[in-house]
Structure formats: C-alpha cells, structure tokens
Design a protein with these regions (language model features):
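Conserved, structured C-terminal
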Residues: 1-168
Length: 168
C-alpha cells in the first residue's frame, strides 16, 4: 500500500488531500454521511434516499416488502416524509456547521430543524449546509440558522449544490 501511495504521489498531477477536501466535495454533491445526515433512526425518504429502494420492493412491486423495517419505510415512501434532508445556502461567508438550529423566523419560535452537515463549498464559492427540515418548506424559502447568538438567513436549496459528474 505504501509503494502504491508513493507511486501515485510521484506524479506531479497528484496531490494528497485530507478529510476536509473529501467532506467539501461530499457536501457540494449533496451526499449524506452516516452518523451525521442519516443514521438508524432516519428512514430513506427523510434522508433523500428514496431512490435506493427498488420499485420491485415497494408497495405493489413483484417482491414488495420483506426487508427489515419495510412497513415504516414503505409507508413513508408512499405517503411522504414529514421532514427531509435539504440543502441550505447561508448568506454571507460564515459556514454553518453540524448541530446549528434552524428557525422559520428571525426572532422567537422553536427550532424547526438542525444542520446535519455544513462547511465551505469551494466549487460554489461559499458556505453550504444540509439540514432535516419540514418537507413542506419550498425551495427558495428563507430560514434562519442560529450562529454565535445571531440568526443568519439561509436559503433552502435543492440538492446537489453542483451538477454531479457521477451516476447513481
């Protein structure tokens, strides 16, 4: 493995990267990270991963159900999720990180969600974040993220933040 890494790095076109670079690419591509944007308690429709359940396994499919958690997963796919993972574009340059609460208004009220992943998106030239928020909030809506005692505007944005060059 070490020989392989050294051979790669001997090429002037190759540079080592770290987790920060990987994370910014993942964020811009709108890809969830287990333990942050999804976990065992977040169903596929909530995580924006409904596409991962084949039609043959859905209600009415030739082999519907039959997998662990099928009843709630299939019900949510059919009826829609109350909350879903969505993109947020903070106004300004301050990155909005994991755990930051999201509010409907600039003052008062309860949090309607929380940022699950966030950071700087070099390809989009600014901060990007993902949060689980109510599904009925339209793209383009302005919400507010509480950062260092202030509520900063964030715009609900479709995922991915960039046009992906990969195929599912």
């Amino acid at each position: 493995l070490e020989r392989f890494a050294k051979a790669l790095l001997a090429d002037d076109r190759v540079a080592p990267i770290g987790l920060g670079a990987r994370d910014s690419l993942r964020l811009e591509a709108g890809m969830p990270l287990y333990g942050h944007d999804m976990d065992k308690d977040v169903l596929p429709a909530e995580a924006g991963l409904g596409w991962s359940i084949p039609k043959v396994r859905r209600r009415g499919g030739a082999r519907a159900g039959g997998f662990p958690g099928a009843d709630p997963v299939l019900a949510q796919l059919a009826d829609g999720a109350a909350v879903t993972r969505r993109g947020l574009r903070p106004e300004g340059r301050a990155p909005i990180r994991e755990g930051v609460p999201v509010f409907a208004g600039s003052e008062g009220g309860e949090a309607i969600g929380a940022v699950s992943s966030g950071g700087f998106g070099p390809s989009v030239g600014g901060p990007v974040a993902m949060a689980r928020i109510p599904s009925d909030i339209a793209d383009g809506a302005v919400l507010f993220a509480a950062l260092r005692g202030k509520r900063l505007p964030v715009v609900v944005t479709p995922l991915p933040f960039i046009t992906p060059s990969y195929k599912r």
